[in-house]
């Protein structure tokens, strides 16, 4: 009678089903640092809520939980799509998720042999930026602070590091590499052991992540080294602790909130209009210059 259109009101109701964000923990060495994980989840949530779905975050522990039972339970839930944190996963553990009857987007890891949708950080580019900056400032052969726990992300960062070393006319074989635990306390303890053994130290280092970089800086300072005057360090991830350590950490920033948004957007697109082709989206990195170089 009055010409009102009530059709839009129905669109605001929650849609049937939930988006599941699955955090897969194998050794828990990386995902246990929650701020990076939380930022990606917050990004997902902002997109999912706009589309009136619910987001449920669940964690699978490889050493404790049974994957077959876990996947069977997922089939009987209200799940309509999965965003799978691939950070700590191996290819053989991903395959069963791709057999589920709903779309999957893999976040924070890429598996060349699996046909799936991916949203990943551009690790090679970020590591290249960091290493090239180190070399331009120090004019010396850089070293590498490598995680003692291997991850695909770290392998890609090593490739970017070596690419920058090569492009600057330096030899890969001359790079000093220390394997350290990927946590602040663990890296500090491991680096103290490196120093106390009298191992050769590099003039500057790129670290697999900020936790390793911060632990290394703490160890160097405990043993009387001045950072960056004697040894420079660049991290990766731009975590909040890097801003408050002395000296503040030069690092690589990845927009994790945005990564979560993009992953959710891709999944929602697949739910609304399934397509045969898949894509890999790489989110670019930025160099954040502070005072550790």
Predicted feature descriptions by range:
Residues 5, 80, 139-142, 203:
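Short acidic/polar active-site loop segments enriched in Thr and Asp
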Residues 16-132, 195-200, 211:
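Alpha-helical recognition/docking segments in bacterial nutrient-uptake
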Residues 26-39, 57-65, 119-129, 145-192, ...:
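Hinge/beta->alpha junction and helix N-cap segments in small-molecule ligand-binding domains
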Residues 16, 133-142:
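Glycine-rich phosphate/diphosphate-binding loops that line cofactor/substrate pockets in enzymes
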């Amino acid at each position: 009678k009055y010409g009102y259109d009530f059709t839009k009101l129905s669109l605001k109701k929650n849609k049937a089903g939930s988006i599941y964000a699955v955090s897969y923990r194998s050794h828990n060495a990386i995902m246990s640092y929650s701020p990076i994980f939380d930022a990606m989840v917050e990004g997902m949530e902002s997109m999912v809520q706009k589309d009136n779905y619910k987001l449920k975050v669940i964690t699978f522990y490889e050493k404790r939980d049974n994957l077959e039972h876990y996947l069977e339970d997922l089939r009987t839930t209200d799940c309509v799509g999965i965003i799978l944190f691939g950070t700590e996963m191996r290819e053989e553990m991903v395959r069963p998720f791709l057999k589920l009857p709903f779309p999957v987007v893999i976040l924070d890891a890429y598996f060349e042999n699996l046909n799936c949708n991916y949203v990943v950080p551009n690790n090679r580019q970020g590591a290249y930026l960091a290493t090239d900056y180190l070399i331009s400032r120090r004019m010396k052969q850089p070293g590498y602070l490598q995680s003692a726990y291997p991850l695909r992300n770290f392998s890609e960062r090593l490739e970017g590091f070596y690419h920058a070393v090569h492009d600057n006319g330096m030899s890969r074989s001359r790079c000093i590499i220390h394997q350290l635990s990927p946590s602040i306390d663990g890296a500090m303890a491991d680096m103290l052991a490196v120093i106390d053994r009298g191992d050769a130290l590099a003039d500057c280092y790129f670290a697999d992540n900020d936790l390793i970089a911060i632990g290394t800086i703490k160890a160097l300072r405990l043993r009387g080294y001045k950072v960056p005057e004697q040894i420079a360090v660049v991290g990766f991830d731009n975590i909040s602790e890097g801003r408050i350590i002395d000296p503040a950490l030069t690092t690589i920033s990845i927009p994790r909130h945005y990564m979560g948004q993009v992953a959710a957007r891709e999944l929602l697109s697949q739910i609304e209009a399934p397509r045969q082709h898949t894509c890999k989206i790489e989110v670019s990195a930025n160099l954040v210059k502070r005072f550790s170089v």
